Amino acid sequence: MIKLKTFFELIAGVFLAASLVPAHAQEACNPDSFTNRDLIICGQQTFEKVDAMLNEQYKKALVSLAPAEKMQLKDVQKKWVRFKEGFCEEIYQGTFPGAEAPIDRLGCLVQTTNARLGELIALQTGLPLDGFYKAATAMAGQDREKGLATSMERLGGAAFDDPLWKQYADGHCEMAGRLFREDFAYCIVRMRFQLPMNR
């Protein structure tokens, strides 16, 4: 009797787990389709992949850092999560009730998560992966000394006054400065460069 009860509990658990998986996760992404439904399915699956990679890199970063830096990384990561959720919700609400609202939210989630993934890798290697410094140097041209600061500001775009982003960026750039001597002001501009274009 106990074995039969355990069997039914197991079956019920499997069905419960299957019902909790979103419908789009069970459907195949069709990259050739531009219907909203397919864009949402593909966007969700892309976000899930990038988010899984980010979680893996976060764990690796925690292992590679000294105890004091681990505490700051945890704090910065929490600030980043609050920023990402608030920022992408704002983008969603800006389009809602339009059919593109979920697509805009997923695009924001993918872009901000991918940018954070690059930051976590950079914290482990000391090498920013966003191409910011290379692009700024190329834009500066021959007169690198004079043109570098100007090209960095142009690449970073307009000031971004979101308080959640500022808390996240300040914490991250403070950490990057301590670990790799990245200039705080340049780091802030570099992080603005990573923000989605529709900010």
Where are these regions (language model features)?
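N-terminal signal peptide c-region/cleavage motif recognized by signal peptidases
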Residues: 20-22
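N-terminal alpha-helical modules
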Residues: 24-199
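Bacterial N-terminal signal peptides that target proteins for export
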Residues: 2-12
